[in-house]
């Protein structure tokens, strides 16, 4: 699905949790950047036609902001909401306003609208972080007690999660229209602005050992004390384990998206039969995740840990094996301690997307029943990504005299409306990021000189872990179409539709960076390809209130941006699951032949 705003393709990006995809570095459109009040109408094109730009295997969604000539004269509107979320226990204000007027016998018009909202939400639940085979990561210390370790599966990181989301959104539109002398020419200038500022605090209580190898103090050190396996699925639905490593994590993100778009459109009627419309426009989306910090504290080698899915597949009973609310039971394992060592992760991510579009289209009515259309277009898409991170995620040891109680706090109230199993933890100790800032000064972007205290955020100038997220892709698309629209009666039945063909050429340039001896080495690539895309759409009304629709087309969708950069990447050689990836600027687009048939009754 492709999204256009005021006639041109656009992209708005933001960031999600890691489990939901993280930073949007692809072609996806994040609708939550905008308030719905900013738009006057939405059109969903479920089938392709030659006059509509290519780029989607399915639908095209067209959004349009309000314009003064939508309703002549002075107009105004104001709305407000004040909602309450009983889970986050917070109020969420929202308001929108619009003012519009036309002058000079409706030859000139201006419209301004604004929308503002705040929202606090809470997300809680259990996550397995996927299931893995018991034989992975070196297997259990006494894995032979299992009948078939390779076909027995357990949760990789069983954990409770509590996520707090904060959101502030401001959007505005300005539209100016002119029809000089109330004549055949209409000029429209549309401007759209939106700013989404978000924060997210993620809190996790998690069992760590089941997804790590021996080098990280993982599964090969864990003893199976008792277990139960579902014979139908091979899932280890219950396990009691000794020597488990338990972790508590707090992560905090600051996320900022700014979207700006301007389009200028001209419509002109040369005669009753010949019409022209054209537009130029630019849409810019800038996303920043300048703060992404996670602190992780540990309790190593816990005996008596257990999980049990037998009563509830989605929400197991978990016994953590110790008092998770006592700060003295937790520790920060410094650079010289046993694995797994505690962590202070810090990074920053940025993504910019720009669309620049121009098009010109003509329509000529051969008769009341038949209209011929033709047009040309040119579009440039630029995607730029950057990332910075610490060189190593290890945490420093606590200074002398600083206790765990000084750098932690108690997360309380977990599990509202979750119907947790009896005895489940509803509170636990978590790292206190502000207290750790006071102790470690991790926001300094500097090397403090203590072991584990290098808090510099490094990108292309020496941090290979970030190289894969430094890339630039430019696509230049030149296209044209011809199309015939008809509105006929055949044997007394209304028949309307269109048939046409679109020809498009795509030119791609990609830049990425490979790790050559620890040095970021630029790698570039170019490609171009052409597509011929015919389409047919027919709608027949065999009887009143009944419409039968048929569509057939060749369609194409361009490859993911992240796959176009010609860079080879390899996971750590000693990692439990080694992976390699290679981008390819010469990837062809996804191509398909689509057929649609629908019957609609009104």
Placement of each model-derived feature along the sequence:
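Extracytoplasmic beta-strand/coil segments of soluble accessory domains associated
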Residues: 1-17, 46
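Outer-membrane beta-barrel translocator/receptor signature
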Residues: 12, 21-29, 37-44, 51-144, ...
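Outer-membrane beta-barrel and related beta-rich outer-membrane complex signature
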Residues: 15-17, 119-131, 188-223, 243-247, ...
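Outer-membrane beta-barrel transmembrane strands
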Residues: 59-65, 81-82, 91-102, 157-202, ...
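Flexible glycine-rich, low-complexity coil/linker segments exposed to the extracellular/periplasmic environment
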Residues: 137-155, 219-244, 305-341, 397-469
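Outer-membrane beta-barrel domain signature, especially the mid-to-C-terminal portions
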Residues: 202, 304-306, 512, 520-527, ...
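Extended hydrophobic/aromatic segments used for targeting, binding, or gating
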Residues: 224-226, 294-314, 506-538
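Outer/extracellular conduits and scaffolds centered on Gram-negative outer-membrane beta-barrels
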Residues: 404, 410-412, 416, 420, ...
């Amino acid at each position: 699905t492709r999204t256009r705003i005021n006639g041109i393709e656009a992209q708005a990006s933001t960031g999600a949790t890691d489990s939901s995809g993280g930073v949007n570095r692809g072609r996806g459109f994040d609708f939550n950047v905008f308030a719905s009040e900013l738009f006057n109408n939405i059109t969903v094109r479920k089938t392709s036609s030659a006059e509509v730009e290519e780029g989607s295997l399915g639908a095209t969604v067209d959004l349009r902001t309000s314009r003064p000539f939508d309703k002549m004269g002075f107009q105004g509107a104001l709305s407000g909401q004040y909602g309450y979320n009983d889970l986050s226990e917070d109020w969420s204000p929202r308001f929108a306003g619009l003012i519009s007027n036309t002058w000079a016998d409706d030859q000139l018009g201006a419209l301004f609208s604004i929308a503002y909202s705040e929202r606090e939400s809470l997300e809680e639940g259990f996550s397995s972080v996927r299931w893995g085979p018991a034989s992975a990561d070196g297997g259990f210390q006494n894995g032979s007690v299992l009948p078939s370790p390779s076909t027995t599966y357990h949760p990789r990181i069983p954990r409770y999660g509590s996520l707090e989301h904060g959101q502030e959104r401001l959007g505005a539109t300005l539209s100016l229209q002119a029809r000089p002398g109330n004549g055949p020419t209409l000029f429209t200038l549309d401007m759209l602005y939106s700013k989404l500022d978000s924060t997210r605090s993620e809190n996790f209580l998690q069992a760590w050992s089941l997804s790590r190898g021996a080098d990280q103090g993982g599964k090969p050190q864990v003893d199976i004390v008792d277990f139960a396996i579902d014979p139908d699925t091979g899932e280890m639905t219950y396990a009691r384990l000794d020597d488990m490593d338990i972790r508590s994590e707090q992560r905090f993100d600051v996320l900022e998206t700014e979207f700006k778009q301007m389009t200028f459109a001209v419509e002109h009627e040369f005669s009753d039969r010949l019409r022209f419309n054209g537009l130029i426009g630019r849409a810019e989306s800038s996303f920043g995740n300048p703060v992404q910090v996670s602190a992780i504290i540990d309790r190593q080698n816990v005996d008596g840990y257990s999980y049990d899915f037998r009563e509830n597949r989605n929400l197991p009973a978990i016994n953590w094996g110790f008092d998770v609310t006592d700060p003295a039971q937790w520790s920060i394992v410094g650079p010289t301690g046993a694995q797994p060592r505690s962590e202070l992760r810090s990074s920053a991510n940025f993504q910019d997307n720009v669309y620049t579009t121009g098009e010109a289209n003509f329509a000529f009515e051969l008769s009341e029943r038949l209209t011929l259309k033709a047009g040309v277009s040119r579009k440039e898409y630029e995607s730029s990504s950057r990332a910075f991170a610490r060189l190593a995620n290890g945490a420093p040891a606590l200074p002398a005299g600083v206790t765990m109680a000084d750098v932690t706090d108690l997360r309380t109230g977990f599990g509202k409306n979750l119907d947790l199993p009896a005895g489940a933890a509803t509170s636990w100790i978590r790292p206190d990021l502000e207290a750790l800032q006071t102790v470690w000064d991790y926001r300094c972007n500097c090397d403090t000189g203590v072991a584990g205290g290098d808090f510099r955020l490094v990108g292309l100038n020496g941090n290979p872990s970030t190289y894969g997220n430094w890339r630039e892709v430019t696509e230049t698309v030149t296209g044209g179409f011809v199309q015939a629209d008809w509105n006929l009666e055949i044997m007394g039945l209304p028949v309307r539709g269109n048939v046409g063909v679109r020809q498009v050429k795509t030119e791609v340039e990609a830049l990425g960076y490979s790790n050559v001896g620890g040095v970021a080495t630029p790698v570039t690539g170019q490609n171009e390809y052409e597509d011929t895309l015919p389409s047919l759409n027919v709608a027949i009304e065999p009887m009143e209130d009944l419409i039968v629709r048929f569509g057939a087309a060749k369609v194409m969708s361009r490859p993911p941006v992240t796959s176009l950069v010609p860079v080879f990447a390899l996971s750590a050689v000693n990692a439990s699951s080694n992976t390699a990836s290679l981008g390819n600027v010469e990837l062809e687009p996804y191509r398909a032949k689509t057929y649609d048939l629908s019957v609609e009754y009104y």
